[in-house]
Amino acid sequence: WCSTCLDLECGASRECYDPCFKAFGRAHGKCMNNKCRCYT
């Protein structure tokens, strides 16, 4: 687990962009182990 990971199931990295933007203000992230990891 990491501080920039979201407990959100994903199937593709693009599914993480909007949640990452809402959570951290940047629409950058990737799908790792079916969870979103955001880049900040």
UniProtKB/Swiss-Prot annotation:
Swiss-Prot/TrEMBL keywords: Calcium-activated potassium channel impairing toxin, Disulfide bond, Ion channel impairing toxin, Neurotoxin, Potassium channel impairing toxin, Secreted, Toxin
Transmembrane segments: none
Cellular-component GO terms for this entry: extracellular region
Site (Aromatic residue of the functional dyad): Y39
Molecular function as annotated in GO: ion channel inhibitor activity; potassium channel regulator activity; toxin activity
Tissues with expression: Expressed by the venom gland.
Compartment annotation: Secreted
Matching InterPro entries: Scorpion_toxin-like_sf, Scorpion_toxinS_K_inh
Disulfide-bond pairs as recorded: C2-C5, C10-C31, C16-C36, C20-C38
Superkingdom of origin: Eukaryota
Residues flagged as site, Basic residue of the functional dyad: K30
Family: Belongs to the short scorpion toxin superfamily. Potassium channel inhibitor family. Alpha-KTx 12 subfamily.
Entry comment, domain topic: Has the structural arrangement of an alpha-helix connected to antiparallel beta-sheets by disulfide bonds (CS-alpha/beta).
Function: Inhibits high conductance calcium-activated potassium channels (KCNMA). Inhibits Shaker B potassium channels.
Protein name, as recorded: Potassium channel toxin alpha-KTx 12.3
Organism of origin: Tityus costatus (Brazilian scorpion)
